């Protein structure tokens, strides 16, 4: 079972500033409490092909994750795909940014997919993610505005 969740928030910062913050995956722990650590694995600035490796904690379990940036259109679009193999993965996710007055509208989404026994828990993970999507968007807003 695969499913999508997401939310939209307006951030009181210019689009270029918001894009730069979100493009740096090492900022993820500033707004995602599940990300315990993360590091860029490739050289150079973030862009298509950049890989981030992280340790996350979901439902009390720590797992290693790797994501690759698949689309990178400054300052409006970032897409990624999880390249690690776990019970539940995010084969696609992203941010869409657009000017909103003096600020920036950010829409984020992730697709969750279960594999093997993970198919049994993917629905539960998706329901939880959908329930927390608006709070996650607010956490992104708070982190960007505090930076």
Q: What residue spans do the PLM features occupy?
A:
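Hydrophobic/aromatic beta-strand elements that line small-molecule binding cavities or substrate pockets
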Residues: 7-9, 65-71, 82, 91-99
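Hydrophobic ligand-binding cavity/cleft-lining segments
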Residues: 1-43, 47
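Short solvent-exposed loop/turn micro-motifs enriched in small/polar/acidic residues
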Residues: 2, 62, 88-90
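Beta-strand/loop substructures that line and gate deep hydrophobic ligand-binding cavities in soluble
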Residues: 83-135
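Preference for bulky hydrophobic residues occupying beta-strand positions
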Residues: 9, 54-56, 80, 95, ...
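Glycine-rich portal/gate segments that line the openings of hydrophobic small-molecule binding cavities
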Residues: 39-86, 105, 135-147
């Amino acid at each position: 079972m695969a499913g999508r969740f997401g939310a939209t928030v307006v951030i009181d910062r210019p689009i270029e500033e918001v894009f730069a913050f979100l493009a740096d995956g090492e900022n993820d722990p500033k707004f995602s409490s599940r990300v315990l650590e993360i590091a860029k694995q490739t050289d150079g600035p973030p862009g298509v092909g950049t890989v981030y490796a992280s340790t996350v904690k979901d439902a009390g379990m720590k797992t290693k994750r790797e994501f690759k940036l698949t689309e990178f259109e400054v300052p409006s679009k970032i897409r990624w795909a999880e390249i690690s193999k776990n019970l539940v993965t995010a084969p696609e996710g992203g941010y869409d940014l657009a000017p909103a007055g003096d600020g920036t509208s950010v829409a984020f989404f992730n697709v969750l997919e279960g594999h093997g026994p993970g198919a049994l828990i993917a629905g539960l993970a998706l329901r939880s993610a959908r329930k927390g999507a608006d709070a996650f968007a607010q956490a992104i807003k708070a982190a960007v505005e505090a930076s």
